[in-house]
Amino acid sequence: MDIVSLGWAFLMVVFSFSLSLVVWGRNGL
């Protein structure tokens, strides 16, 4: 596993996590 794929995986995790936080914030948790 190279650093590029590791960086992309980390980026996707952060993106999905922030997106779920935005959805939860709009729904009032």
Swiss-Prot record:
Keywords (A to Z) from UniProt: Chloroplast, Electron transport, Membrane, Photosynthesis, Plastid, Thylakoid, Transmembrane, Transmembrane helix, Transport
One cellular component (GO) term of this entry: cytochrome b6f complex
One Gene Ontology MF term: electron transporter, transferring electrons within cytochrome b6/f complex of photosystem II activity
Topology class, membrane: Single-pass membrane protein
Localization (cell): Plastid, Chloroplast thylakoid membrane
Organism superkingdom: Eukaryota
GO BP terms: cytochrome complex assembly; photosynthesis
Function of the protein: Component of the cytochrome b6-f complex, which mediates electron transfer between photosystem II (PSII) and photosystem I (PSI), cyclic electron flow around PSI, and state transitions.
Family: Belongs to the PetN family.
Protein's name according to its UniProt entry: Cytochrome b6-f complex subunit 8
